[in-house]
Amino acid sequence: MNRHLWKSQLCEMVQPSGGPAADQDVLGEESPLGKPAMLHLPSEQGAPETLQRCLEENQELRDAIRQSNQILRERCEELLHFQASQREEKEFLMCKFQEARKLVERLGLEKLDLKRQKEQALREVEHLKRCQQQMAEDKASVKAQVTSLLGELQESQSRLEAATKECQALEGRARAASEQARQLESEREALQQQHSVQVDQLRMQGQSVEAALRMERQAASEEKRKLAQLQVAYHQLFQEYDNHIKSSVVGSERKRGMQLEDLKQQLQQAEEALVAKQEVIDKLKEEAEQHKIVMETVPVLKAQADIYKADFQAERQAREKLAEKKELLQEQLEQLQREYSKLKASCQESARIEDMRKRHVEVSQAPLPPAPAYLSSPLALPSQRRSPPEEPPDFCCPKCQYQAPDMDTLQIHVMECIE
């Protein structure tokens, strides 16, 4: 409203004043004394010229005033355009200011959100660091247990290798005995060409040899029976091992140890049987040396010798088959040991992962009462299952008598206490 009022006043101020009033203002004005100022016109001859000159000056003044009014109008329009442009620029700047303020507010909210996310990430990093430290401690304890188990396994393997070497030595002795028997057979053939007497004594000696052969056959049948028992025990052991793996991997370790001891006992029994057979062979060798001078080439003795030779060949083949079966059993036992080691490693890995998952859940949730001791240590599970549930295990430090709630805490404390 003030702008329109000022505009109207400005237009009225620059309007040209024409007509008689303007002429009157030009021709005469009031003097300071209140009297009208009259033009001192000359005489009648100079009045038209003066009037003409005054009119021309008045016209020039009007033209000048008109030009100045035109210039003022143009300046006024320029001023109005400038004010409109300033107003538009102000509105644009106000809009930009509002947008900038909204942007600042949004950036402030995003900054707060990012700050919260940063704090949450820092908390998660701290949690992961604690989990990583706990995993390192668990890894150290598992490594110690694996080292002890590997030591036990190496000790059992060394015992098995010693037993295998003894068995190979016995087989070498058996081969040496067979070589000696072949030498005796060649000597018998030589003596068979030289002697042709004492048929009755040879018959009696043949009967004694037959008795020895019967004893040898009985011993061979006994060994076959023991081999069959060993095979049945092995199949039963394999079935029990398979069932035991499905039911309990940790319990199968001790069961496998007992079965390994049974196999060692059976192997020792087989070695004792081989030693007894070697003694029988030695006795037969002594008897052959004693009766070497009285042997002759009679058909009956030759037939008995052929029968003895055939029985000896059959016995040697049976011994070779027994050795092959023994090697096959040894390979199967080694295969079972490898499978057992793999299953044990996978069981330990799954137990470790399950323990880590439980710990992660316990850390993320509210604090809970301490878990039972039989759940804290996966390797101590079989012994704790056999113990009565009413008697809690004693996790006590042997150095400072510190009572730990579980096996993991006890292992960590013992390592720190020793250091």
Curated annotation (Swiss-Prot):
It is found in: Cytoplasm; Nucleus. Changing K321R: No effect on MARCH2F-mediated K48-linked ubiquitination. Residues 242-350 are annotated as: Ubiquitin-binding (UBAN). There is a cross-link at residues 111, 139, 143, 226, 246, 264, 277, 283, 285, 292, 302, 309, 321, 325, 399 (Glycyl lysine isopeptide (Lys-Gly) (interchain with G-Cter in ubiquitin)). Heart, brain, placenta, lung, liver, skeletal muscle, kidney and pancreas. Changing K358R: No effect on MARCH2F-mediated K48-linked ubiquitination. This is NF-kappa-B essential modulator. It comes from Homo sapiens (Human).
